[in-house]
Amino acid sequence: MVFLQSPQASATRSRKMLRPPFSASNHRRAGISTFLFLVLVGLAWAGPPKAPADKTKYVVAIGDVHGDFDDFVGILQRAGLIDAQHHWTGEQTTLVQVGDLLDRGPKPREVMDLMISLEKEAPKAGGRVVALLGNHEMMNIMGDLRYVTAENYAAYADGNSAERQRSAYQEYVKWRTSHAHLLAELPQPMELTEAEWMARHPVGFVEQREAFSPRGSYGKWLREHSAVAKIGDEIFLHGGIHPNLAHLKLDTINSHIRDEIKAFDSAKQDLLDQKVILPFFTLQEISAAVQAELTAERKSLVPLDQQKQARLVGFLGYGDWLSARVDGPLWFRGYDQWSEEEGAAQIGKVLESYNAKRIVVGHTVQKGGRMRPRFGNRVFLIDTGMLSSYYPGGRASALEIQDDAKFTAEYMDQQMVLVEPAGPSVRSGAPE
C-alpha cells in the first residue's frame, strides 16, 4: 500500500510534528490561585534537573541534481530545509546528497555554491549537510569533461577569458610543435586546427579547469568529501557497494578513493613538471600524451628510466581504480539491474558486513520519476531524473527518513509513504 498525502500536507509541517513538542496542559486551569501556588512550589523545590528531550532523528536524502539548480531549490524548500533566500531552515535535520551535483544541466556552479553555503549554515542550527562524491564529481576532478556543456564553461568566464583562451591555444601550438615526435606515435591525432581546438576548449574552459584543480575553489571543496556515509542504520552513496567489495570497511573505501585522487593529482603534477602535458589538458588529452610518451620511451635507444615508466604505466591504469571501476561505489548499477531474487541474497551479505539495515543510492534514473524501494525495502533507489529537460518524465524528489523507520518520498506535488512503521513490524508501501 502506498500512502498519499495532499500537496497541502507540506513536508515542513510533517517535520515539525516530529520535533519534541512544547509542554502544554490538556486541562483547564482551576484558577489563578492554583496556578500561583504551583509556581511558588516549583520555585521552592525544582527537583532534580530533567534530561533534555531526545531530538527526533530526521534525515533527508536527495539524488542526482545534474546542475538543475531551480528544481534543487524547489525540493529543498518543499522539504522545509531552506527558505526563499536559500538559507537553512532545517533545524536539526541531516541532509544527504548522494552525488552528481554536476554536468548536463545549466547551473552546476550555483548548485555547488548552495551546498557549500548550507554546509556552513546547518551546523549553527544543529543540523548537518553531507555531500557525497558521485562519478561526475570524479570525472570533473580528473578532467573527463564529456558531459560539461559550453553553457557550463561560460559560467566561469570573465572579461579576460577570451584572452586566456587565446593564450592557452598558443601554448598548445608550441607544445604540439615540441612534441611532434610523440604525437606521431598516436593512433589518432590530437586536434590540429584552431577551429577544432577552440570548439573543444570554449570560453571559460581554462577557468573551469583551474576551479577544479587541487587549489581551485571547487576542486579543493570536492577533495574534502567522502564517497560513502553511514547515518543511523542507513548507508548512503552514489552507485552502491558490490558484494565483492563488502569486505572493505566504509572508512577504507573513503580513504582509498581519496588516495586515488591524491595519486592522480601527484601524477599530473609530475607530468607537468616533465613538460609532458599542459595544465588545462583533459583526461583524454593527458592519456594520449602519456601513451605517446611511453611508446617513444620504449622505442628509444636510450636505456629506459624504470621509475618514470612505472609512473606512466600506473597512470594509464586509472580505469582499474576503485573510483573508476564499473563495480566500484561510484559507478555500480547492480541494485537497479539485479532481479529481486538475485538481489535479496546479495544485499543481505552487504548489509551484514556493515551492520546496517538499508542502503540509499542514486546514479540510475528510475522509470516514471518515482523512487523505488527494492529487496524488501532494504535498498532505496532515489535518482528520479531531477533534470527533466534531459530525462523526460523525471522530477525533483527527496527521501525523508524518520527514526530509521518511516520512509517518505517527497515530490513537488505530493508525498508517498514508502515504508510505514506499524508497531513492532514495518508495513511496506511500495510494491516491487
Question: Where are the language model's segments positioned?
Answer:
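N-terminal secretory signal peptides that target proteins for export/translocation
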Residues: 1-27
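Short intrinsically disordered, low-complexity coil segments enriched in acidic
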Residues: 2-3, 31, 125
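Feature recognizes metal-dependent phosphohydrolase scaffolds
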Residues: 13, 22, 42-432
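A generic signature of intrinsically disordered, low-complexity regions enriched in glycine/proline
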Residues: 30-31, 387
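Bacterial N-terminal signal peptides
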Residues: 33-42
